[in-house]
Amino acid sequence: MASAKPKKKNPRLASGRKRARQDVKLNAANTSLRSKYRTAVKNVEKAVLAGDKTKASELFAKMQSVVDTIADKGIFHKNKAARDKSRLSAKVKALALAA
């Protein structure tokens, strides 16, 4: 089966073993934050498509917090975070002006 990952060897040095333990925790935390980011962005996009400007602006404020957290932790580059916030901000503002 091609989908099975090859088993990794256990590190010999104590520092390597510690690093492996930390990697598991960090991977779980990063995956969780990345998922929270995707959900926040999707919720704002849905609100914009639905035309609900109050909900869109409320969700956008929460999304900004999530994006800033992810950029601060280095999961995404700060420029990507700024770009995503800018694009969604433009959509929310366009919705407010249209209505």
From Swiss-Prot:
* Biased composition regions of type Basic residues, renumbered to the chain: 1-20
Q: Which UniProt keywords apply?
A: Ribonucleoprotein, Ribosomal protein, RNA-binding, rRNA-binding
Give the Gene Ontology MF terms in alphabetical order.
small ribosomal subunit rRNA binding; structural constituent of ribosome
Q: Which GO terms describe its cellular component?
A: cytosol; small ribosomal subunit
Signal sequence residues: none
Positions of region (Disordered): 1-29
Protein purpose: Binds directly to 16S ribosomal RNA.
Xref: HAMAP family: Ribosomal_bS20
Q: Which PANTHER family match?
A: 30S RIBOSOMAL PROTEIN S20 (PTHR33398), SMALL RIBOSOMAL SUBUNIT PROTEIN BS20C (PTHR33398:SF1)
Task: State the name under which the record lists this protein.
Answer: Small ribosomal subunit protein bS20
Q: Which organism is it from?
A: Paracidovorax citrulli (strain AAC00-1)
